[in-house]
A protein has these predicted regions:
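N-terminal Rossmann-like FAD-binding beta1-loop-alpha1 element of flavoenzymes
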Residues: 7-31
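An anion/pyrophosphate-binding glycine-rich loop and adjacent beta-alpha core
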Residues: 37, 210, 216-316, 382
Length: 458
């Protein structure tokens, strides 16, 4: 591994991969990931990815996104995401992503909660895996990209230029400083600090902890999304998501008596509240979701969900399955502008790590992959433009002036790493207090709705 790169990308989900693919091919790029390369939440996305089908859908797409976000979204970010969606989809298709098509070869669109029309492209019920695996395969072909798994970011290196690199802990446990012209944080959300989450457990908000110590601004850190339907289990570990597209295709929620009790296509936070109320009313630990009302062949439309439920003892073609809300997504994050720049020079953030305000207080279903791709590309293009303006020679000079940390600096770096470990403990304690987290978050939403029921938004 080199000590100097043009860019270091932390994370190899869709945001990290898309950024790497849009940086100059002559640039030296290092990508690191804390676990295996396929252990990103991007791989877990089931439902699909939104796209602006045609100009006539713009107003509705915009309104659906704003409405789901309680009108706390940043309008500019929403506009950029929607306007950029078709170009992103065309790129994905060019890179081999296989979206579902009809018998005439036309793209198929599905609908999910809080969408006023069908505008979501999908690949069975493993859309995230399809997109991320194809992008990752393209990244691995690039000779200018070094990809290291089981390599953890412990801190950033800062100086007169702002962010000047990252401190990493390699696979052998050694602390290594890596200098770079620019750094992109694309290392996911915070689900790992919750007991009940659909996220991988190693996603523990690393960038947020570092941002706090480095005075990099955060935004909307109290906005955590609870997904209404995960497969209920008494086992510990990551919760299996039952995609929103299941309800979009016609599945219904049932109480303990087998009666439907809510509108399944409301925004996620509203459906989660309704499920919680019903569980308290029925004195149960879950509600039921029936897929028998779906007119399609569910085994063919949702093969991954069918197989997983079968492994847990449920045949979705014959019986309802137990579902319960769980932590799913983080709308907050490291504050960025429309080019994914943080408040520290030469430091960018994209994907769930960042907060550009596009989701507001609650994310609209299937906007996450799209947002990650759109703003990762914008980060890469902004970096490339600045490199072109400055010239690679300047970067080479910067590399030559960068020096190894002295002994006292190494002690400081090691101390910072110890502080980082304390941060994890603090965050775990915070999550423990927030068992509050799942149900109190829903109760707070109830209180918010009650206090603002006469308030007009927009």
């Amino acid at each position: 591994m080199k000590k100097y790169y043009d860019a270091v990308i932390v994370g190899c989900g869709v945001a990290g991969c898309f950024a790497a693919l849009h940086l100059p091919k002559e640039a030296d790029i290092l990508m690191i990931t804390k676990a295996d390369t396929e252990d990103s939440d991007s791989f877990l996305a089931q439902g699909g990815i939104c796209v602006l089908k045609n100009e006539s859908d713009y107003d509705a797409f915009y309104e659906d996104t704003m409405h789901a976000g309680h009108y706390e979204n940043t309008p500019e970010s929403v506009d950029i995401m929607i306007r950029s969606s078709r170009n992103v989809i065309n790129q994905l298709i060019a890179w081999g992503v296989d979206f579902r098509r009809d018998e005439n070869g036309e793209l198929c669109y599905t609908k999910e909660g809080a969408h006023s029309t069908s505008r979501i492209l999908f690949h069975d019920d493993v859309t995230g895996k399809e997109i991320t695996s194809k992008l990752l395969a393209q990244v691995k072909k690039l000779p200018n990209v070094t990809l290291l798994a089981h390599t953890e970011m412990c801190d950033i290196l800062s100086g007169k230029n702002g962010c000047e690199g990252v401190l990493i802990r390699d696979e052998e446990g050694k602390l290594v400083p890596v200098y770079a012209r620019d750094v992109i944080w694309a290392c996911g959300g915070i689900g790992g600090i919750y007991d009940n989450s659909t996220n991988f457990p190693h996603l523990t908000g690393d960038a947020l902890a570092i941002a706090i110590h480095r005075n990099v601004a955060l935004k909307n850190v109290n906005y955590v999304q609870i997904h209404p339907t995960t497969l209920y289990s008494q086992k510990k570990g990551r919760r299996f998501l039952i995609s929103e597209s299941v309800r979009g295709e016609g599945a219904v929620l049932l109480d303990k008596n087998g009666e439907r009790f809510t509108d399944e296509l409301q925004p996620r936070d509203m459906v989660s509240r309704e499920i919680h109320r019903q569980m308290e009313k029925d004195h149960t630990k879950h509600v039921w979701l029936s897929l028998k009302t779906i007119p399609l062949d569910v085994k063919e439309r949702f093969p991954n969900i069918y197989q997983k439920c079968l492994e847990e003892g449920y045949d979705i073609t014959k019986e309802p399955i137990p579902v319960v809300p769980a932590q799913h997504y983080f709308m907050g994050g490291v504050k960025v502008d429309s080019n994914s720049e943080t408040t520290m020079d030469h430091l960018y953030a994209a994907g769930e790590t960042s907060c550009n305000g596009v989701h507001g207080a609650n994310r609209l279903a299937s906007n996450s992959l799209l947002e990650s791709l759109v703003f990762a590309e914008r980060a890469a293009k902004k970096m490339a433009a600045e490199w072109a303006a400055e010239g690679l020679v300047e970067n080479a000079d910067r590399k030559e002036t960068a020096t190894e940390p002295k002994e006292d600096e190494w002690k400081l770096l090691a101390k910072r790493y110890d502080i980082r470990k304390e941060d994890y403990q603090d965050m775990e304690e915070y999550a423990e207090r927030c068992k509050e987290s799942i149900w109190d978050a829903i109760r707070k939403e109830d209180k918010y709705e009650s206090n603002h029921k006469n308030t007009k938004c927009g």
